[in-house]
Amino acid sequence: MGSRQVAVYFAWSRPDEENAQLGTLENRFTALFESRRIQWPRQEHLADPAKFDQGIAGFLDHILLANFAMFADFASSLTGNSVRIAQRQTRAAHTALSSQWLVGVDTLIIISWDSNRSKQQATPEELQAVRALLDTPGSTVFICPHHDVGDVRELSADEGFRNREAEFHHHGDPAIPSQQRFGMFGRSLLDGLGLPIRNRFGLRPAKAADGGPAPLKIDPSVDRFGLLSGVTTFNLHPHLPHFEMLGESASKFDVLARQPIDLNAPPHPFVERGRDDFDALLQTRQNTFPGQLLISDTTLWTSAAEGFESLQQFWRNVLQLPVR
C-alpha cells in the first residue's frame, strides 16, 4: 500500500492582503505590530523590525503560516512525502490550482483564508482540476473557508451596526474587526461543483471544565471512513464558522461533527435563533464523487488553539486513509 501525497493550497492573493490600508479596520488581516500589542508579551520574540516585517506581511508569515508548519511536518513524517505547498498569488508568481500542480496528489487541502474584498474566484480550469481529482477513487479534498464575521448585506444600517456589535462581543477577540469576511475562493469552487455551502459567522466554541475544547457531537453512523475515530475535540479558535448547506447540498452532505457554542459568551443572533452548536465538519455522501469531499474550517490544520492531541488524531486518520 502506498502513502498519501498531501498538497496545501492557500487561496489568497498576498499582494491584496498585504496592501490593505491599516487605517481601515474592516476586512483585512491584523498587522504584526497590532498582534504584538494585543497579545503582549507573548509575541515579543517577533519585536525586532530589522528581522520581522511589522505589517500584515509579517503577521501572515510569522503568525498565520507558521501555525500550519506543524501539520506539514506531521504529514511529511507520517507519509514519508514532503507536503506540496503553494500560495495562489505572491509578489513573485501566480500559482493556479491546476491539473499540472496536482499531478500525483491524492489529498488536497484548500485553505480559503482569502479576504472577500480581494474577490478570489476559481477559474473553469481550476474547477475542472478539482473535479478530476474528486473523480479519482480514494482521493480526499478538503475545502476550508474561514469565518465570515459581520455580513450585514440584508440589514438596514442600524440593524447592521447592532448585529456587528453583537457578533464582536460574542467572539470577544479584540484583534478581529466588526467585519472580516473570508472564503470566496472556496465558495466559488463549491458553487461550481453544484454543492453551494456558506461559511456563516464567527462563533465562539464552548470550553470543557478543564479549559480545553468541549467534546464534539459526532455522528459515527455517517463516518464511513473513520475520520473521527479517536477524535473527541477540534480546537478553541475564538471565531469559527457554521457551514450552511444551500439547495441540493443538504441532500449531498452529511454532518460528521457539530461543535458546541459557548453559551456563557454574550449572545449571538445564531444562538438566539435556537442553535447551541454549529456544523463543523461536512462530508459528501456515498456516490456523490468517486473520491470524497469534506468541508472544515482552516484552523483544523493549525496548532495554535488548544485541542492539539485530538487534532493530531484527526490528521492521522486522514493521512492513513488507504491509497488506491
Placement of each model-derived feature along the sequence:
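Short, surface-exposed patches at the edges or C-terminal ends of soluble domains, predominantly
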Residues: 1-324
